[in-house]
Amino acid sequence: MRTSSIYIITGAVLTALLFTVSAFGHEHTALNGTWTLVPAQSNFEGQPVIQTGTVTINERAGDITVSRSFKYEGANDTFFYRDLTDSQNSATIHTGKDLKTKTRWDHDVLKVTNTYKQSGDVTIESYSLGPDGTMLVSVMRPDHKPITLVFERK
């Protein structure tokens, strides 16, 4: 009788361990792909309107690449940003002398924190999947109202 109790307890512990390892090994691939901005559904809060924009996210084995390309209303140039970070090991990527970028997963929300070294300003971008399958991006910058950008999968 005592032997069967040990097997039951051991089995329960191993099962719990298996589920714990599976949860921590989870890759966040739902946001992977190229997304196109839907300006009419986005809220710019009085900031310069983005005419066109794409975001490409690739999360694989803890390495995350976020590429962003935007063209602002009235501007002749297209702005391109690309961050490659290692969220699994909490790496911080220094992009040139002026920018430090860090990504992390907060449950199913991808958070990209950009710190501008000279000013110390911090911009936080939060990427999440909306209930209708769109990607919602919330951008919080110092001294600005938060903006919400809506993207559709390309």
Model-derived regions: residue spans:
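Hydrophobic small-molecule pocket/channel-lining residues, especially in calycin-type beta-barrels
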Residues: 25-154
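Positively charged n-region of N-terminal signal peptides that target proteins for export
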Residues: 1-6
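Short helix-onset patch at the extreme N-terminus, typifying the N->h transition
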Residues: 7-9, 35
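Bacterial N-terminal signal peptides
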Residues: 10-20
